[in-house]
């Protein structure tokens, strides 16, 4: 195992410390229990959005705390769900009187612990469950489809609505619409190593790829030989299109996400291939996102997410955002403490 580590037991704390120092103009990190919140308290009467999950997927979720997205994020240990007391403490810290909306990826541990945290919290709250992965219906960590990269899109789009006065009910309704109209497929060329384990999550040959891999290294649809990028991308899109069934000329957002170990040069190549394929099918790409947003430590691979867009979705996607990992449409001054 080759990683920047001092002591495995201190890995998460040191990482969170560094994150807090690097982005002290936007966020603050709270310990015991661990959660990340906005530096400036949410304005009164705004719905507060809280997400979280196991660490190792950065910048999801802590990198999306800030104006136009999340109010707080709860990081668990690497690939492990956060504990209910984290969600309770985060909610108590950021609730501004309009209620709390928890955004939860569909993994058994996450759902159980977020549900317990919501029950422990005495304030008004509700939840969205994301399950955009079209690869498999059931997996090692889930009953039903896994929640993966489209969670980022939910957090951005719902975050805008919440920032602009949407009610708890309206925010949940929009989040469910985004989730329902999203589909994701991932491919891995390599495994990844959880620091506490010290060895790869799974074994894979140098000439093999896992088609439909999960963000914790869960098995996908099949293991096969690596093929040319256009073939891989076409197969990924076929799976997504079979699920979403977009209409010809329907507006979409195309999101190419890196798993952590794949360079941007390759991600843009994937995006180019995807654009050509979707154009040939008469599908309009009106918005795009390319980069490492929902990762799996150092895994080499990528996922493709397609989101069918209406005017409400596009309006909230385009709205200003300022977080550690996603920012546009705002002029800000920086003050590091």
Where are these regions (language model features)?
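Short Gly/Thr/Asp-enriched flexible loops that form oxyanion-binding sites at enzyme active sites
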Residues: 111-124, 266-272
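Short glycine/threonine-rich loop-to-helix capping motif typified by GTGT followed
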Residues: 259-276, 296-309
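N-terminal, Lys/Arg-enriched amphipathic/low-complexity engagement segments
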Residues: 2-42, 52-56, 60-64
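Conserved small/polar residues in nucleotide/adenosyl-binding loops
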Residues: 335-336
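C-terminal edge-of-domain segments
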Residues: 290-322
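Mixed-charge interfacial surface used for oligomerization/domain docking
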Residues: 164-269
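Glycine-rich oxoanion-binding loops at beta->alpha junctions
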Residues: 57, 64-66, 70-96
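Short alpha-helices
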Residues: 128-181
């Amino acid at each position: 195992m080759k990683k920047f580590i001092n002591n495995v037991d201190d890995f998460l704390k040191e990482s969170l410390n560094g994150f807090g120092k690097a982005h002290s103009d936007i966020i603050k990190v709270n310990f015991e229990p661990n959660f990340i919140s906005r530096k400036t308290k949410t304005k009164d009467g705004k719905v507060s959005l809280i997400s979280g999950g196991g660490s190792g997927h950065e910048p999801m979720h802590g990198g999306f705390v800030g104006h136009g997205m999340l109010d707080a994020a709860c990081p668990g240990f690497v690939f492990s769900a956060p504990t209910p007391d984290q969600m309770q403490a985060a909610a108590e810290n950021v609730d501004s009187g309009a209620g709390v909306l928890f955004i939860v990826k569909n993994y058994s541990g996450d759902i159980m612990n977020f549900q317990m945290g919501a029950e422990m919290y005495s304030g008004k709250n509700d939840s969205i469950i994301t399950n955009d992965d079209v690869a498999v219906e059931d997996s090692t960590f889930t009953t039903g489809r896994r929640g993966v990269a489209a969670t980022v899109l939910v957090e951005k789009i719902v975050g805008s609505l919440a920032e602009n006065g949407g009610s708890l009910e309206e925010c949940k309704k929009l989040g469910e619409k985004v989730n329902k109209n999203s589909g994701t497929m991932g491919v891995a060329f390599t495994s990844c190593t959880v620091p506490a384990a010290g060895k790869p999550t799974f074994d894979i040959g140098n000439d093999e790829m896992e088609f439909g891999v999960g963000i914790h290294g869960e098995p996908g649809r099949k293991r096969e030989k690596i093929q040319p990028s256009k073939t891989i991308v076409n197969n990924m899109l076929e799976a997504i299109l079979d699920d979403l069934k977009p209409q010809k000329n329907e507006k979409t957002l195309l999101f190419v996400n890196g798993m952590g170990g794949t360079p941007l040069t390759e991600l843009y190549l994937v995006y180019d291939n995807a654009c050509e394929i979707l154009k040939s099918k008469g599908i309009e790409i009106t918005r795009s996102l390319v980069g490492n947003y929902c990762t799996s430590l150092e895994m080499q691979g990528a996922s493709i997410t397609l989101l069918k867009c209406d005017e409400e979705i596009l309006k909230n996607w385009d709205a200003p955002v300022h977080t550690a990992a996603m920012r546009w449409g705002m002029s800000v001054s920086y003050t590091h403490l």
